[in-house]
């Protein structure tokens, strides 16, 4: 049984963080922190992990698979799952912050294809562990739906599907929609002007599409070029019904589970099942990506924490890390000496001098409605297990929760001077109102239903929008997920475990291994650039609505966002 801080009022405080924390069945009273004082040598470990989110916990999990005898200590300032890992949009997707095209430009085509396969496999691997360990986290693998609601967005959808087909990994399919909110099928035959503009968006982790993790939504390799069908798998001459997800009694495994002794290979993508309709206002078509599962993120991260504790890992909460070096982690409650140190702080790394400019803490906010009746969900057409988004530039993402709410989020909150992170920044009445308007516009059926929860939090954005994992001189790092961390953290944990233990693995040769993003510029350049970029993203959507052409603003800013 874990020890807790007696008399601590943390349970109520932490339940107020999000819908997910409010509905997790755990006691959120913090685990005991390190028992010492600053500068005192308190503990020894083989591996000390800085950060009690999914990156740190997945790393601990796979380390215990490879070597159960390892002494592993996790150090967390608040509670396990306090940050983006527990607050995101609940998309366990195959999205990666850098698009497939960007990966190819930087690392070559073969490396880009291997990275895409690794991400698709990761969705199945998370599902395998959830089932094997009995983690009750509302897992349902229904895929994600990305709606095209204008001719420009339809061109983007076609291009994304064609690009995915060219890489041969992601099994995206494009469908016209039948339903009360769908546009007339003749619109699908309209051809917008050709353009060389390329657009790709990402889902996110605090609001996971969280970059589609739920903060964020989009698909890797999303691009809008010509309106021609070149490479698209289907002609859209008439409405088609959309494939519904399979009913899953347990997460479906795409390949064999990992073993500690043999080299691991990357598997194949998945497919989907039977027909039904989707109703959304003004929607022309939808792209279905099967490589995504709906999840309750706080249940996942809290459940994973219990699993690693059962395996002998020690978690110290209420333990603020001040700094680290090879062989030692310094905290406000004493020092831990360790053979290897894992730094897994994501956006919160911006609060420490050593990593202040490594990532930019970008806020993503969410709302959740009261539960909707089954009859309303029938008219909406979103099934359990499906996540959803559309092709706008200012990202939105959502899911139907296990208790029949809309959980819906997006970008729009400004960057704060000096990369500061404060509880007050988790909430913005302006952004919350924008999210409710966006949800009601997308699904008018949601309009009469009250919003019961509002929350947000920072995710970590590297300067080149390219996540990375490193292990050098006894210090391992992982992060820069830009909201795609709900799944990418699992790949990071597996990869770091292999790097730290020296296990034979295909994962340690993936393109993101050893990648180091450049630092962000100092202020005021960082403040000006981040907020001007945010404004340009919103203007890009307005530009496309007015001109019915791909946005020039989006084209000009695309290289700054990993596309």
Range-by-range predicted roles:
Residues 1-47, 65-66, 70-71:
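Extreme N-terminal leader/targeting segments of oxidoreductases
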Residues 36, 136-146, 178-193, 270-303:
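Helix-loop-beta segment of a Rossmann-like dinucleotide-binding subdomain
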Residues 64-87:
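Glycine-rich FAD pyrophosphate-binding loop
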Residues 95-179, 226-229, 235-244, 250, ...:
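Dinucleotide-binding Rossmann-like beta1-alpha1 core, especially the glycine-rich loop
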Residues 133-140, 321-323, 335-375, 379-473, ...:
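Active-site substrate-recognition segment that forms the wall
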Residues 162-165, 281-339:
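Helical element adjacent to the flavin cofactor pocket in flavoenzyme catalytic cores
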Residues 490-509:
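Internal hydrophobic alpha-helix adjacent to the cofactor/substrate pocket in enzyme cavities
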